[in-house]
């Protein structure tokens, strides 16, 4: 099933902890198929994988390939990274203060919420023909860039880059420009 329920006392006995966590009648769900880090941490049992953040910061590889079978938490791990690094209006550090990454030191805490993050998934771009798939991919890219609308008024981008984003927003870019 998509919503396996594990009795709370069983999990705490296994983990050797008595820390209570509010849930649905004392029973929390296992987050099968949920890819939202914030939702999983708030409402489900979560095995702390935040040391992945430390590993990524320390190793500084230019490219990282996550290879795991289906349903092994790749998308959830990527959403955790996005939640950790992304600069947002709301304070997302609350989702990490009781996790292992927070006890690793100030070096890592300073990086929390410090960067604009582009996170793209094509999981919903499934169509039977290339033309529809291509339009869906363009929309995913455009929507992700538009999430960072603060760039339109910042000094971060030069005028050509601001024009590019403006034309992306109004769907005026050519196929060649999208490939840029």
Where do the protein language model's features map onto the residues?
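P-loop NTPase motor core
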Residues: 33, 38, 48, 54, ...
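Phosphate-binding P-loop
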Residues: 53-61
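A short, Lys/Arg-enriched interface patch at domain edges and termini
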Residues: 9-24
């Amino acid at each position: 099933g998509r919503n396996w329920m594990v009795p709370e006392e069983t999990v705490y006995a296994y983990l050797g902890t008595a820390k209570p966590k509010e849930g649905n009648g004392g029973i929390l769900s296992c987050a099968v198929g949920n890819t939202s880090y914030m939702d999983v941490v708030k409402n489900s049992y979560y095995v702390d994988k935040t040391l992945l953040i430390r590993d990524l910061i320390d190793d500084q590889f230019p490219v990282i390939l996550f290879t795991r079978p289906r349903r092994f938490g790749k998308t959830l791990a990527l959403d955790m990274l996005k939640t950790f690094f992304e600069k947002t209006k709301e304070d997302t550090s609350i989702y990490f203060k009781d996790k292992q990454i927070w006890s690793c030191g100030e070096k890592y805490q300073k990086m929390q919420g410090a960067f604009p993050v582009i996170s793209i998934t094509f999981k919903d771009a499934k169509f039977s023909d290339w033309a529809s798939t291509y339009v869906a991919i363009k929309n995913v890219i455009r929507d992700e860039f538009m999430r960072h609308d603060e760039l339109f008024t910042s000094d971060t981008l030069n005028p050509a880059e601001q024009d590019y984003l403006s034309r992306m927003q109004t769907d005026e870019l050519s196929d060649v420009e999208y490939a840029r």
